[in-house]
């Protein structure tokens, strides 16, 4: 007789808000192994394969956000038919009204689920009243799939792409599970041509996919989660209980945590896509190696920064209407980019700081006569990296803290109670955390050729060697995991 644990079986199919499905969870890793087997069986049956992947993607989203998967379906169906309507008319006002409707649907959903309570507080404060918060659930990844779908309708409006005629293809594009929860934001012009190509995964694609999944899992589940639970959260939850040097180390820890968390997710998403025969563009390119804030935004969350540039900054006028307008457009773009991350004044401040810094750097480039893209070298680059990294860390204080006053408390502690003599004691008390932090920053700052060499080594491993590598990593993750699942940070956006 089979001894079936029906409770465990139920957990596979029923949404649990306390245990959302994420790439680093055990249930996903086992389900993905089964998914790959079915995917390979359907390799010569295109329509069945697209249906299977789309259904799995909706299941994946249901396990992350429950019944709110209907929002994903709503955005998909509405934008598909809006784009079809735009393609069928050459009347200017009809096309413009259609893209405005797409904007209203996507941004309206985003505004309700993400900004209702924030805007209520703002208006109540302005009018001298009070606002009682609504209990509104924030669906995972809503900022990502609305922006991704919006880029499609805007591109159709601009006549940059030809709209799809098959709803299944569009549903596949919007819901493709590797990037559904937290990006990268994949452009239609890059992804859609890949949908109906014959399934092909080269030896190099397979090897790089395994390497990216392994490195992403290592960054997320071993480095990011461990330093978060065992150090960073304690500092940020009560900064006034800790000295300035402890707060500063906490900020450095968060800078590494958010990078390893988000780039780890992106690496896993890109790696999983490669195993399925799809190519995504790189989303992170060693951002803390940047010698200027402009370079940082060319390396950090590349899919979002390029989206903001192409669909917001350029739409505002970009650099075409004079320097003053360019600087204002940069600040406005980053202000809205801050709001995209969350409904809080902390995110507004974070975005404004980055916008002002970008404008200041553009002004400095003009003042010194340096050309766009011109890189510094030697000692100038070293100090550029040092200054940029610490500016970004300063901004992370506002990004991470729950409110503005806590951010100011942390800055005050760093400036007034530094106490460097406590550093040896701090290292002794948290030596495991600092070993992982040192390892994380070392891996980040090591030359790109080292990463490429590691990738080639994994690619050359036989299939059994790759399996042993993944099993060993999974075992290590299980040994080091905290008692609770640590969702990816960008799931909340």
Which stretches of residues belong to each language-model region?
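Membrane-embedded transmembrane alpha-helical bundles that form the catalytic cores
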Residues: 2-492
